[in-house]
Amino acid sequence: MTKENICIVFGGKSAEHDVSILTAQNVLNAIDKERYQVDIIYITNDGEWKKKDNITQEIKNTDELVINDVETGEISQLLSKGSLGKSYDAVFPLLHGPNGEDGTIQGLFEVLDIPYVGNGVLAASSSMDKLVMKQLFEHRGLPQLPYISFLRSEYEKYENNIIKLVNDKLTYPVFVKPANLGSSVGISKCNNEEELKSGITEAFQFDRKLVIEQGINAREIEVAVLGNDYPETTWPGEVVKDVAFYDYKSKYKDGKIRLDIPADLDQDVQMTLRNMALEAFKATDCSGLVRADFFVTDDNQIYINETNAMPGFTAYSMYPNLWKNMGLSYPDLIAKLIDLAKERYEDKKKNKYKIDY
């Protein structure tokens, strides 16, 4: 059987750089190397692209993926041809956060006319920006918790007015979030005005725009979505925490979470969550994969929190485990995502790019 040549891209200029490397390690160890010949491109924190061909060995430590012993390559040349001597069948970007999950690199792949796994430019960018995402959800009629958003420049000029607005519109606790980061980077749970000001200062280190959301005592439920024009969903899973707030440290370092799959919910609530996940997928014009995150209260009120256009594939990650519960193994999930990338690319080729006069 002729192998398909795949390129996995990871790292990147983002606060989620290390998460991306961890995700790449997991995917490289799971991908079917009998079916795929896998090259890798590591993007350093400084934005340099470094490539290695035909990765066959198990990656035992993430340090093995920090490539320093090759020269920085010219981007279009690195992506133009794989180690099998032909164009890549697909590129698999495993980049989290700005410059990778936000539509930036997806635009590059579009310009270079390369099939790639995951969401397109519009879906990636709108799912990355929490304010834009919330506005699209609102237009679709999806229930959300109250929130406030503002820019760093606005806060510098109108700090007192903004603090008053938060105190008037929301009740503590609230969550302060950079608008364009994931993996809970820069997020703070604030129980009073002093913590609010500290959380705002922290979040503005990572982004020029913030979202402050109403806190709620609710269960955190997640649904995985997979597909292009006709997506499928999983049964919901629940994030059960041994900490007050599911932050970056508890997600990736401490292991202080448990994933209950499937979640212990009434059947009708589970079906509502699956349908809402599909609506969220459509609201941001997604393709490939999405994880939709929800809050569910004790009386089964449901609020959508966000969609994640590039959910992690680490050992702690909900997305692959949700599909495993549906009978789709990790290697088969990776293969399905690559097939979806090629399917979308072939569909795009049906478009006309010139007008016949």
Curated annotation (Swiss-Prot):
UniProt GO molecular function: ATP binding; D-alanine-D-alanine ligase activity; metal ion binding
Keyword field: ATP-binding, Cell shape, Cell wall biogenesis/degradation, Cytoplasm, Ligase, Magnesium, Manganese, Metal-binding, Nucleotide-binding, Peptidoglycan synthesis
Q: Which positions are annotated as binding Mg(2+) 1? A: D293, E306
Q: Give EC number(s), comma-separated.
A: 6.3.2.4
Positions with a binding annotation for Mg(2+) 2:
E306, N308
EC class: ligase
Name the domain of life this protein comes from: Bacteria
Briefly, what is this protein's role? Answer: Cell wall formation.
- Report what the protein is called: D-alanine--D-alanine ligase
State the taxonomy lineage. Answer: Bacteria, Bacillati, Bacillota, Bacilli, Bacillales
